[in-house]
Amino acid sequence: MNQTKTKMEDSIIDYLALYMEDPKLNVWHLVLLAAILSLGHEQGDRQRIRVSRSKLMQLSHINTLPTYHKYFKQLQELGYVKYSPSYHPGFKSEVKLFKKRLSQNY
C-alpha cells in the first residue's frame, strides 16, 4: 500500500475521531462529514473538496432533501464546513473542512 494513501486514511480517522467527540453532532452530521471525507479521499484533498448534493446524499444514505439541508446547514453554522456553491451546472460546489468547530453558537 502506498505510504501517502496510508497517511490520508489515518488523517480521515483523525478527523472522524475529533468529530465524534462533539456532543452537538448526531449521526446525520457524522454521516455527512464521512461522505465529504470520502470524496476528499477520492480527490486526494482533505481541505477543498468538490461536492454535489446528490453525491453527498447517496454516500450518506440520506434520502430526503429536508433532512440533508437541515444537517448540512447546521454543519455550516457550527463552523465545521465552509460551503461555496457553484451556480453553474457544469461545475461542482466546493466544501472546505475544518477539524475543529469554528463557531460556539448553536
Predicted regions mapped to residue ranges:
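Short recognition helix of helix-turn-helix/winged-helix DNA-binding domains
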Residues: 1-59, 77, 105-106
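Winged helix-turn-helix DNA-binding recognition segment
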Residues: 40-102
